[in-house]
Amino acid sequence: MDSREIHHQQQQQQQQQQQQQQQQQHLQQQQQPPPGMLMSHHNSYNRNPNAAAAVLMGHNTSTSQAMHQRLPFGGSMSPHQPQQHQYHHPQPQQQIDQKTLESLGFDGSPSSVAATQQHSMRFGIDHQQVKKKRGRPRKYAADGGGGGGGGSNIALGLAPTSPLPSASNSYGGGNEGGGGGDSAGANANSSDPPAKRNRGRPPGSGKKQLDALGGTGGVGFTPHVIEVKTGEDIATKILAFTNQGPRAICILSATGAVTNVMLRQANNSNPTGTVKYEGRFEIISLSGSFLNSESNGTVTKTGNLSVSLAGHEGRIVGGCVDGMLVAGSQVQVIVGSFVPDGRKQKQSAGRAQNTPEPASAPANMLSFGGVGGPGSPRSQGQQHSSESSEENESNSPLHRRSNNNNSNNHGIFGNSTPQPLHQIPMQMYQNLWPGNSPQ
């Protein structure tokens, strides 16, 4: 061979070596991942160990090729052997590296490098936030919410995270994908929790409804049963019951029959308005009330009784009781005692101490079965059974009380001026409540 040809071949080999070195440097730059990928995506390299091995093998082959080119030209190796080694091995190596980087979404552009760093930082933050606590999560959140979607996040201690953008938007779109994720997270955090709804009736609403009805509400309602035997005056028994304490009394119902009754029924034919009925009448209803009233320092009970009766022929009579109401059979009267106003009762507690009250009021209130004294209507009725009804009316305690007043007074159950109950002769009830002197 001529010296010119040898020199020309040497120049070609040098040019080929320079091109190979430039290609190797470019491949090394492409194979080197960005700093963010080294920090966060360490799992991706573990998933594809063949790619890492190929990168290391390519690096070693390139080093051996460089050392082989530095050997003297006159060696035993022919000049064509390095060229075959150079052109056959880097091609599969370059294809493997390119596929590995494409699988990671890295194309070597600056935008993809920035997107990869941003994605790696976000992935690291989300990995810290999604750390699950031990133990069973609470059923209800701290703010009282249910165990729904929002409550489960609060119970697990997880912040509402925005969904990660897709690989195409994250790597191809650059900062736009990250901005969309941040705006979604801001919208999720900006939503306020629902207001807690209180249960039950608002405080004070029940009292407002009672005040709207007018009047005062009673407290301490207690039911009682008064038993009246045949021949006794029902009205007198009720009056004796109301005189035993400061509580107000209301008559609820009664069962039984009556024989003699005086009712106030004013009409044109009877100006006085008092009518007497004799015979056997069944009690349909008995109602009334007795409340405390104070005048000139004296506390009295005022009220009236109303009764409806049914005769044997189906005739119904009724009106306000203005005299006697004699029982024709065993009669049971259901009454209730209550305190009209609790606040006023507390204020007048000192005054109520002067009024004696039985220690066991319900037991005494139910013991009305005793025999009356000499002045009871029953004994008087037996002694004067053959006399006229006018004499029986004059012997009734209620009628005697009305005779002591002026002629315009219609009795204790009328609408006349209230009189103290201690004016009624109560000697017949001394044996019923021992220890309580009649007032």
Swiss-Prot record:
Residues 131-143, 196-208 bind DNA. Residues 9-31, 79-95, 376-386, 403-416 have a biased composition (Low complexity). CDD domains: DUF296. Residues 143-152, 171-183 have a biased composition (Gly residues). The PPC domain mediates interactions between AHL proteins. Its main location: nucleus. PROSITE patterns: PPC. It comes from the Eukaryota. Residues 1-46, 69-216, 342-439 are annotated as: Disordered. Residues 130-139 have a biased composition (Basic residues). Residues 109-120, 347-357, 428-439 have a biased composition (Polar residues). Coiled coil: none annotated. It comes from Arabidopsis thaliana (Mouse-ear cress). InterPro entries: AHL, AT_hook_DNA-bd_motif, PPC_dom. Residues 217-359 form the PPC domain. This is AT-hook motif nuclear-localized protein 13. Keywords: DNA-binding, Nucleus, Repeat, Transcription, Transcription regulation. GO terms for cellular component: nucleus. Pfam families: PCC. Transcription factor that specifically binds AT-rich DNA sequences related to the nuclear matrix attachment regions (MARs). GO terms for molecular function: minor groove of adenine-thymine-rich DNA binding.
